[in-house]
């Protein structure tokens, strides 16, 4: 009888702990992330401190042709314990000599990256592709959250093409559904979705905005910039009943690292001109 009570208590504790586990996910445009930035110990310290807040972090504007900076970043993220973070990184993406990578860093004790692919947006040499930097989509499996499998679609939109690229994410979502049979999808990144790049009159032409399939978690009123501007450039959008239901209420917001760490304007903007946007899943 005593053994049965102990077993029951352990099962209850396990259920309680599992219920308390949440997954924190972020998208962070780290301005011109490369070897120069990773050679500055002060900046590295803060970048690692910021990224260590998250179980999955999408890093954008990775300018690192040989993955030297990415390697240094992972070394720093894993300095206290090996395999604290793993990563998935895209090839350099862009229509001309200027190229960027998408980088996902994630905690393998919380999630697994189980698959990935590049969205086929048309013929780049022909000039009829949709995105300047086509999404490199990653499928994750989480043992501890209400939604076990979900995909993340990253986008760093070109400012001048922001309206068209955000609208085209609707097609990317349909493609993910067709390829993986997956409805639970998070679309995130620096969409340049505000101020002069997306005018109020243009939202009605963006299917990702008008379709009830999608829930925008970062509002237009948010400021995701570390500069004197006030713009909601960086966004998190979710689709799928399980994923939408797993979002912790009021957890989606920019992380103002300048205020959190008491940084000067100069130091904050040396880290990046953007704040991360984050959300928690239960």
Curated annotation (Swiss-Prot):
It comes from the Eukaryota. One of its GO terms (molecular function) is deoxyribonuclease I activity. Its EC number is 3.1.21.1. Its main location: secreted. Changing residue 154 to A: In allele DNASE1*3. Its cofactor is Ca(2+); Mg(2+). The record marks 87 as: Nitration by tetranitromethane destroys a Ca(2+) binding site and inactivates enzyme. Divalent metal cations. Prefers Ca(2+) or Mg(2+). The record marks 35, 89 as: Involved in actin-binding. Residues 1-22 form the signal peptide. One of its GO terms (cellular component) is nuclear envelope. SUPFAM superfamilies: DNase I-like. InterPro entries: Deoxyribonuclease-1_AS, DNase_I, DNASE_I_2, Endo/exonu/phosph_ase_sf, Endo/exonuclease/phosphatase. Keywords: Actin-binding, Apoptosis, Calcium, Cytoplasmic vesicle, Disulfide bond, Endonuclease, Glycoprotein, Hydrolase, Nuclease, Nucleus, Pharmaceutical, Secreted, Signal, Systemic lupus erythematosus. The active site is at residues 100, 156. It catalyses: Endonucleolytic cleavage to 5'-phosphodinucleotide and 5'-phosphooligonucleotide end-products. Disulfide bonds join 123-126, 195-231. It is found in: Secreted; Zymogen granule; Nucleus envelope. Principally in tissues of the digestive system. Highest levels found in urine, but also relatively abundant in semen and saliva. One of its GO terms (biological process) is apoptotic process. The keyword Hydrolase applies. It is linked to Systemic lupus erythematosus: A chronic, relapsing, inflammatory, and often febrile multisystemic disorder of connective tissue, characterized principally by involvement of the skin, joints, kidneys and serosal membranes. It is of unknown etiology, but is thought to represent a failure of the regulatory mechanisms of the autoimmune system. The disease is marked by a wide range of system dysfunctions, an elevated erythrocyte sedimentation rate, and the formation of LE cells in the blood or bone marrow. Serum endocuclease secreted into body fluids by a wide variety of exocrine and endocrine organs. Expressed by non-hematopoietic tissues and preferentially cleaves protein-free DNA. Among other functions, seems to be involved in cell death by apoptosis. Binds specifically to G-actin and blocks actin polymerization. Together with DNASE1L3, plays a key role in degrading neutrophil extracellular traps (NETs). NETs are mainly composed of DNA fibers and are released by neutrophils to bind pathogens during inflammation. Belongs to the DNase I family. This is Deoxyribonuclease-1. The gene is DNASE1.
């Amino acid at each position: 009888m005593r053994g049965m009570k102990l077993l029951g208590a352990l099962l209850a504790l396990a259920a309680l702990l599992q219920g308390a586990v949440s997954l924190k996910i972020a998208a962070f445009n780290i301005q011109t992330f490369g070897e120069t930035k990773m050679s500055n110990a002060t900046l590295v310290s803060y970048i690692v401190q910021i990224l260590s807040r998250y179980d999955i972090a999408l890093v954008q504007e990775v300018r690192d042709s040989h993955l030297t900076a990415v390697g240094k970043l992972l070394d720093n993220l894993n300095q206290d314990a090996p395999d604290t973070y793993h990563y998935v990184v895209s090839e350099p993406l862009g229509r001309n000599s200027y190229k960027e990578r998408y980088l996902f860093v994630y905690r393998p004790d919380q999630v697994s990256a189980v698959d990935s692919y590049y969205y086929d947006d048309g013929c780049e040499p022909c000039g009829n592709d949709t995105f300047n930097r086509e999404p490199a989509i990653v499928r994750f499996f989480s043992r501890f959250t209400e939604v076990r499998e979900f995909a993340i679609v990253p986008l760093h939109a070109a400012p001048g093409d922001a309206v068209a690229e955000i609208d085209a994410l609707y097609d990317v979502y349909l493609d993910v559904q067709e390829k993986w049979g997956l409805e639970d999808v998070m679309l995130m990144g620096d969409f340049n979705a505000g101020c002069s790049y997306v005018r109020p009159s243009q939202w009605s032409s963006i299917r990702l905005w008008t379709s009830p399939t999608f829930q925008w978690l970062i509002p237009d009123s948010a400021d995701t910039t570390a500069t004197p501007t006030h713009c909601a450039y960086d966004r998190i959008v979710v689709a799928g009943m399980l994923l939408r239901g797993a979002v912790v209420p009021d957890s989606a917001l920019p992380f103002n690292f300048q205020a959190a760490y008491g940084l000067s304007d100069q130091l904050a903007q040396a880290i990046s001109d953007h704040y991360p946007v984050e959300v928690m899943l239960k």
